[in-house]
UniProtKB/Swiss-Prot annotation:
NCBIfam families attached to this UniProt entry: efflux_Bcr_CflA (TIGR00710)
Gene3D superfamilies: Multidrug resistance protein D (1.20.1720.10)
Family: Belongs to the major facilitator superfamily. Bcr/CmlA family.
Keywords: Cell inner membrane, Cell membrane, Membrane, Transmembrane, Transmembrane helix, Transport
GO MF annotation terms: xenobiotic transmembrane transporter activity
Compartment(s) of residence: Cell inner membrane
Protein name from the UniProt record: Uncharacterized transporter RF_0358
Transmembrane segments: 3-23, 42-62, 73-93, 95-115, 135-155, 162-182, 209-229, 248-268, 280-300, 309-329, 346-366, 377-397
GO term, biological process aspect, one: xenobiotic detoxification by transmembrane export across the plasma membrane
Species the sequence originates in: Rickettsia felis (strain ATCC VR-1525 / URRWXCal2)
Length: 405
């Protein structure tokens, strides 16, 4: 297969980090948005739910369009949509207008994930692809975590409007840069692949294992993003910490995530621990973190604690969970599509859309149970972690049955 041009790793990185960094920057301003529009915090949080639904729709459709029309034009189209919707968000006069703009923004920015992954697969194969992903992995964990700090400083020294000014400027710079230098990597643009797409869709609909993997990935990412949409109300609104200080606190989670990523690599490459055992260890870390989080949350409801102690009682369990998150999720993504090797692009877009719908559902639940304390969210985290562990056990049972046949 002839490659038209390889995409450099730094271009992939800019695509990959755009969406998660956008969301972590935005969530720092949720309390400010709530006060500005004079609405309940739970309503403000639903803007993130719509964001993930828009993202799911983008993954499902834009990835497919890039197979037909090429990666470069669809990537540029997505960035253009991202910029326009960010500009519209600046002038939102009510929460409904902002919700629509956020949905469209997510639809556009989804090219960072779906087109970025497609371009990576077009440009690199085998061990070279693994090396590119491995070299980018620490940055993919580190840079989005800076988003809370960036958002915190923007909110503290200006207003939520300037969050979208920031998105508009960064999006415009990326669009101009990529218009000049982004290569086309799809060497076999094909206008007649719809039959294959629907064939894969029919198989996926019946694939119980894939649905269970989608639930696990969606649940764990739902916990991650759910924390970022709930925590600002607890720390900024209730504990009265500054927006910038909250951003620094949220940044601590990145170190736990990076540690989990390096621990997984060490166990697999240096200690030759089987991938499935690493996944099991990830569940153990997650369960321990979520159980401790739930216990601490209910203790904080009945016992008065200093701000420093309360912060530690919330962040330490989440850091433990994040270690588990990054032991588990990379392995889950690897195994989920193992039976779809010949149609990874098509299957990946459908699979990604499914688990982003799960993330949207989790963030919607977070908005519905929003309260003045963290206990409701902590209980949800515990339930999701237990449910994911049960799903993993069901996958193991289904694999055993499959191999017996």
């Amino acid at each position: 297969m002839k490659i038209i041009a390889k995409i450099p790793a730094w271009m992939l990185l800019c695509l990959f980090i755009l969406s998660p960094t956008t969301e972590t920057i935005y969530t720092s301003g949720l309390p400010s948005l709530t006060k500005y529009f004079g609405i309940d915090g739970g309503i403000t949080q639903t803007t993130s739910t719509l964001y993930f639904l828009g993202f799911a729709l983008g993954i499902l459709t834009l990835g497919r369009l890039s197979d037909i029309y090429g990666r470069r034009p669809i990537a540029l189209l997505g960035l253009f949509i991202y910029v326009i919707s960010s500009i519209i968000s600046i002038f939102a006069v009510n929460i409904e207008m902002l919700m629509i703009a956020r949905f469209v923004q997510a639809f556009g920015v989804s090219v960072g994930s779906v087109i970025g992954q497609a371009m990576a697969r077009d440009s690199y194969q085998g061990s070279e692809l693994s090396y590119v992903y491995a070299s980018l992995s620490p940055w993919l964990l580190f840079i989005p975590s800076l988003g809370s700090s960036i958002g915190g400083y923007i909110i503290e020294y200006s207003s939520w409007h300037y969050v979208f000014v920031f998105f508009s400027l960064t999006g415009t710079i990326l669009l101009a840069l990529y218009y000049k230098v982004l290569p086309e990597t799809n060497s076999y643009i094909d206008f007649s692949q719809s039959s294959k797409y629907f064939e894969v869709l029919q198989v996926i609909i019946k694939d119980k294992i894939l649905w269970l993997y989608a639930f696990i990935i969606g649940a764990f990412n739902g916990i991650y993003y759910g924390f970022f949409i709930e925590a600002p109300f607890i720390f900024i609104d209730k504990m009265k910490v500054s927006s910038s200080f909250y951003g620094k606190l949220a940044f601590l989670l990145s170190f736990a995530a990076i540690f989990g990523g390096f621990l997984g690599g060490y166990l697999i490459k240096k200690r030759h621990v089987h991938d499935k055992k690493v996944m099991g260890l990830g569940f153990i870390f997650s369960l321990c973190g979520c159980i401790l989080f739930a216990v601490n949350a209910f203790i904080l409801e009945v016992v008065s604690a200093s701000h420093s102690l309360a912060i530690a009682m919330i962040f330490v369990p989440m850091m433990i969970h994040m270690v588990g998150h990054n032991l588990l999720i990379p392995m889950t993504l690897r195994y989920a599509l193992v039976d779809y090797a010949k149609v990874t692009g098509t299957a990946g877009s459908i699979f990604g859309a499914i688990y982003y719908v799960v993330i949207a559902a989790v963030t919607y639940l977070v908005s519905k149970i929003h309260s003045e304390t963290i206990s409701n969210f902590a209980l949800l985290c515990f339930v999701l972690s237990i449910s994911s562990a049960i799903s993993f056990y069901c996958i193991w049972v289904l694999y055993k049955k499959k191999h017996k046949l």
